[in-house]
């Protein structure tokens, strides 16, 4: 049997991230959450998301009753799984790095989009399951619109947030506020 493991949201600007574990043969699918707090300042610098990923993968494999003697894991190539790889090697777990596509990828990206829409309130029609620059700017613009209330959702441990994007977000927020005031007068 084969278990696929993938992530979503680990490189996105805001919100929680998610790990998905999927047993192909039975269709069993489970999710685990990496809190946005893990991606802030010291937690990020101390690689807390990578440590938590190991814990969550272990927990997910237990729930799926994983048997290392007759199952293989197809593991997403993402950096979030770097310490998971070490764990698999130490435990003699048979795994392959792979590009995860199909049902699991769709499900775990869907979990992220649901979180962004339903938990955080991102309403843009431009928000899709496809990661990349377009999604970054949808999320960035959402933060800018109400910066001081939404900054708490930012993965502020990311270096570029503190060296580039935070200042740009404040600047954009201030421009929007001035524009709103002009419209009222």
What are these regions (language model features)?
Residues 1-185:
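RNase H-like, Mg2+-dependent phosphodiesterase core
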């Amino acid at each position: 049997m084969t278990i696929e493991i993938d992530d979503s949201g680990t490189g996105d600007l805001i919100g929680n991230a998610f790990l998905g574990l999927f047993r192909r043969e039975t269709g069993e699918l489970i999710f685990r959450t990496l809190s946005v707090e893990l991606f802030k300042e010291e937690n990020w610098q101390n690689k807390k998301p990578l440590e938590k990923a190991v814990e969550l993968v272990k927990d997910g494999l237990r729930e799926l009753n994983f048997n290392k003697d007759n199952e293989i894991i197809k593991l997403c190539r993402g950096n979030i799984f770097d310490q998971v790889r070490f764990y698999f090697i130490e435990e003699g777990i048979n795994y392959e790095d792979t590009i995860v596509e199909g049902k699991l990828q769709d499900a775990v990206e869907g979990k992220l989009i649901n979180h962004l829409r339903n938990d955080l309130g991102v309403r843009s029609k431009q928000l899709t399951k496809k990661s990349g620059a377009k999604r970054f700017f949808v999320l960035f613009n959402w933060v800018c619109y109400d910066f001081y209330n939404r900054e708490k959702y930012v993965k502020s441990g990311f270096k570029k947030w503190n060296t580039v994007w935070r200042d740009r977000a404040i600047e954009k927020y201030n421009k929007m506020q001035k524009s709103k005031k002009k419209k009222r007068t």
